[in-house]
Amino acid sequence: MKEVINSLNYLSNWPSAGSFEFNTNILETNIINISVVLGVLVYFGKGVLSNLLDNRKSKILNTIQNSEELCKGATDQLEKARARLWEVEKRVDEIRVNGYLQIEQEKENLIKAASANLKQLEDSKNETIFFEQQKVIDQVRQQISYQALQKALAIMNNCLNTDLHLRMIDYNIGRLRAKKPN
């Protein structure tokens, strides 16, 4: 770019040779002067412009290449993340299913344990009731036996006299002797 400006300055300071000169006033410039200036600009600016465009092109290509590499890396990371997400979701589903199964199993175990405890309590209750019934029955038997014995003794004492009492004793002693082996 500097070369173009220097060339234009050089041409503008060139001494005029009669009818040919550079008109620096843009409003008074004619088509020939403009075409000469454009020709000079194209001639001298071609290399600079070409270099600028080549540099810009290489920067754009590098940027595109870097972007493509970043995109590929991001795509790879996305695929890895999706694979990891799939594994995590699968593991979560397994944990959820195992958790539900374990909850159901614990529930069944608790129900079985509660049923066993209830049966054990029922058996214990029945045993206690049976024991208490037997105890009451034994007490009633004892009381009935005692009352019957008391009644029998009272009847005997009222009905028996001494003579009958002695005969009864002798009779029972005779029976006992008959049963006794010699």
Curated annotation (Swiss-Prot):
GO terms for cellular component: chloroplast thylakoid membrane; proton-transporting ATP synthase complex. It is a single-pass membrane protein. GO terms for molecular function: proton-transporting ATP synthase activity, rotational mechanism. Its main location: plastid. The keyword Transmembrane applies. The keyword Transferase does not apply. Belongs to the ATPase B chain family. F(1)F(0) ATP synthase produces ATP from ADP in the presence of a proton or sodium gradient. F-type ATPases consist of two structural domains, F(1) containing the extramembraneous catalytic core and F(0) containing the membrane proton channel, linked together by a central stalk and a peripheral stalk. During catalysis, ATP synthesis in the catalytic domain of F(1) is coupled via a rotary mechanism of the central stalk subunits to proton translocation. Component of the F(0) channel, it forms part of the peripheral stalk, linking F(1) to F(0). HAMAP family: ATP_synth_b_bprime. This is ATP synthase subunit b, chloroplastic. It comes from Welwitschia mirabilis.
